[in-house]
């Protein structure tokens, strides 16, 4: 098979490279087309356009395929858990026992939200849309950790492990805080000794000062 596609516009011919994806599907690389021809392509809604090359995920909605780093999502749902899958997406491989323990500890270290972030959430009306409040909460979180968003690419890449752990952990706490705020209740304290999903469920449904056991079946289903 040829590794180029030929395009004719009027009496002009253009040779465009072909890119083969992980599932052997082909794409036409038009990145140089405008420069060479001053012609652009039109794809309403970008339903037929790939935005980037990715080693992280593969999605084919028509066929019901979703893969993370080559692993079928159904296999991960059955044999893995949330933090293992998050580690896979971030690092390209499933973690060893020691790597998972270290990742779990790093994530647990950011479970408690800064006071100013909680204040931001409490300032929102109880009936506000959760996604709008989550967006404002993440913005407030960025203000609490300026060292992770310096706009210095080198520095930000060096702190990527910490900033990713922060977001993974804080989104869970933000979701629980938003739910509690909608009920007019305070957020329950986190427990670093609990698992990721166990902590989330506890923060969602415990009253402040309570520590109710989370049913293992519910935790497992969420994880």
Question: Which sequence ranges carry the predicted segments?
Answer:
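Hydrophobic alpha-helical bundle cores within soluble ligand-binding/oligomerization subdomains
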Residues: 2-223
